[in-house]
Amino acid sequence: MRANEASKKEKIMNTIKNAKFTRNDTLCTISTGDLFSKEDLTGLNRYYKSWKALNEENLRFKMRRANLPELLSEGLASALFGWVRTNATSISGCSSSSCDLVNTETGELIQLKACSTTANTPAGPTSFGPRSEFDTLIFMHLDCEANTASFYKLDANVYKDWMLNRIETIADQQAQGRRPRVTILPKIKASNIQPFYVYSFE
């Protein structure tokens, strides 16, 4: 088989249907999900390089950097940790399907937030829905200077007490039906939270 033919047939993630897991003694089912594997890391590394090169060209032409793609956050997390990417699909047995990933071994619903930084671009804000339901909050910091993705595990309840201004917390704005926005990376640094995993792009 020629090299270009092999490239065209390169394996790219698995789409799984009706994946079952148990959460709080309740059987739940993900109607359709994406499961990446270590074999997908080659493609993800290539995608990262293309995205980084695009941003460098954007800046050269004085354009804004492209947003961090979900493939480089949720897709990478799925490949590294074996979590199923829900891709906003329905999950029977759960009152909410607002999570991004599911650990089908433990039954954890995972919300993943991410940001990317460069030497001249600080971390930007992310938002939480007013009715977000999840068990574990994961934050990924993609450092485009070091070419690393650092994963942090945050308390899924403590984040609601983060102050957004002098009088309101995330929980306060969620109770008002609003979508609070917060820059997470400085709060991680201030709390001296260490990453549980650091991935280096090749």
Task: Tell where the protein language model's regions lie, with residue ranges.
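Nucleic-acid endonuclease domains
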Residues: 2-109, 113-202
